[in-house]
Amino acid sequence: MSTLEEVCEDVRKRIGTVTRDDLGPVSARDFQRFAVAAGEPPGATAPPLFLSSVLGWGAGPTGDALSPDGTGDETAGLPLDGLRLMGAGQDLDFHAPVRDGTRVVRETSVEDVTLKQGGSGPFLVITMLRMFADESGTPLVTCRDNLIARPEAPR
């Protein structure tokens, strides 16, 4: 069994396991800055893509802490060390507006993983489910992220 096959099996065992994170309150200042950066007018509610785009409210990793593909070490606890990660699209459902002070809770789980063969070799397609809700459980955004994970290119 190849290393990629082993990773696939390890990720498959995690399907359905939910990790819950309290992201804390959303700040109007943060989502209004996001709106301006995205070319939208700032408003009283967060832009639709705000929650699915922000991994946390902190400053994030420094440039030297990023891997060569530009990702940090946030991989939802998956064993993806040594693999290159690429986004492969999102499906989003918007349920309720996000306003200043809304305390956001995120639940993350693996929904699916598939080992595929491409022209340049094998790769994994991983579907992650991220559900954002307020502290009372009211759904805000449901996000299905598709990721491609492939071995580092030979040097």
Question: At which residue positions do the language-model features occur?
Answer:
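HotDog/MaoC-like acyl-thioester-processing domains
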Residues: 1-12, 89, 94-155
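Hot-dog-fold acyl-thioester-processing enzymes
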Residues: 1-89, 154-155
